[in-house]
Amino acid sequence: MFNQELKEFAVLNFANPPSHRRLAVVAAAVLTLIASQAQAQTAKPYFEFKKPALISIPGDLSLDSNGASAPLFNAPSSPYLMGFEGISQYDGASFTRNFIPPDTMGAVGASQYMETSNGSYAVFDKTTGARTALMSDVAFWATAGQTGANGDSRVMYNTAANRWVAVAFGNDVKDLQLAVSDTANALGSWKSTKFEGYGGLGFGATADYPTLAMDTRALYIGTNNFAPDTAGGSNSFRGTTLNVIPMSSLFNATAPTVTNMARFYTPYSNTSTTNADRGFAQQGVNSVTPGGSGTVVAASLFNEDNLVFKVNGVLPGSATSASLGAVTYIGQQAYTSPGAARQPSVAIAANRRVVSAGDERISSSVYEANGRIYMVQTVDPLNDTVDETRVHYTVLNAATMAILAEGDIGQAGYDYYQGSLAVNSFGEVVIGYNRSGLDPATGKISFMGQSFTTNASGQLVARSGELLLKESLTDDYHNGSLFGAAAVGRQRWGDYSQVSIDPSDEHKFYLIGEFAREYNNAAGGHPGGTGGSRWGTWVAVVDAAAVPVPEPTTWLMMVFGLGAVGAMARRRAALGTPA
């Protein structure tokens, strides 16, 4: 009976005590170290170059940006308060900035919501969802003082400083540019700086997949470095760089500066037997806890596990004396990298499993609150019998790095991917993600969310059911070929999503994720459109304080269960299901 329940409910898996997992990971690390003495350590081959492509489908013209959904408002008692459409691929195409995927990213501020994507930036009224500005990424960076932009943008709002912070590729993708607003108004003036993220080997380079995090001491930007070793050669992974910028260099009376920045380069070579493992897609841990050292987490280059290390010695005015602490592998439940995600694609069977669910890198922000560190990633667990992706969350003790809780959000018959989370000072956690499957009625790629609270032991206790925030408008998303055709090329999705907390009311969480818009043709409302698919983004506001607490029996099962624990059933129609 319990196994049947696991098939019908979202799954939060607390199997395998952390101490046993930690011993297993230590043993695996020792074996890996021994093996490395005789042969080269090779990074996971699917940790690949992610710079987006500016696509141009032959014959596919975008003549309008019709069809945006109106804002959605639910009853104040509903945990899903409001939803509104963000930037779409139609918007980017209007600037001839037609990138895939969007690199979905946004943050909520004092009165606005700001979104960045590959090609376009936008600002919205956070209470009504009304869009107050739309611009190309190139135009935004021009007003901030830079020339050109090339995607991979991220944005955050710093509540203590009441300022916005954005990062993106420069015109040359070896460079990173960093902008800070002068006030809390995202539509006001910004100032910026540019610095070389990774110089390469003399034949071009990319400081790929820049991450962004802030604590009370510094701002952290991690990059995955790629470069060819010959003129015209292909890009290969060359290591990572962690850039640490003290807060005083960021928020000052003039402009952001990197004069007192620390840079930690960890090289990688396919032929080396001594490659250090400081992970892939290094994510600084966001925290408002004063003092102490910074913390960085990442997926291991070699093991199916995450690792963590400290950044020590960042002074109020300088990071130049900072140093990195030793790496600790946290010892997660066994998993493998996820496969492609499913979708119904009723008309074209070949397109039913083409959408990229990504890999196990930590693609979205990581948070510390109340002495605990929270993170999510996409995995294919080895403790189930289905080849389906799950959003895996992990909670760590911030002092010891011991796992307090971990689990998989998922339901049999569906893939779950592109997760993100945020946590407030009350220990309330909201996780957003995509879900899709083969079922024609419920399998379209959907943007979903769930809320949790953290108990005294650090475990997540479900508060809401699975909330449908936005459903895709087509059952067959493929970008790179026209409507009715088989998918061509890699079907990128994401590459990330984000959750942020309203600085005016920390019970309110703003989630942003990707969905599939209608095709660019007459049937989709685009006269003269020639048939390419288009992505969209959706912003949802979830009030964690309005979410009902589970029944006592459910709570007891979730806290004290020794194996996998069933979460609450999905709640859809009662909470609003936007088309």
Located regions from the model:
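C-terminal PAP-associated
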Residues: Q41-V547
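A short, hydrophobic C-terminal helix/tail in secreted or cell-surface proteins
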Residues: P550-A569
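Hydrophobic alpha-helical membrane context
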Residues: L33-I34, G563, A573
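Short, Lys/Arg-enriched N-terminal segments with co-localized hydrophobic residues
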Residues: F2-A10
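Gram-negative bacterial Sec-dependent N-terminal signal peptides
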Residues: F9-Q39
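Generic extreme N-terminus detector
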Residues: E5, F14-N16, T553, G561
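Serine/threonine-rich, low-complexity intrinsically disordered segments
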Residues: E5, I34-S36, L556, A579
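C-terminal membrane-anchoring or membrane-association module
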Residues: G566-A579
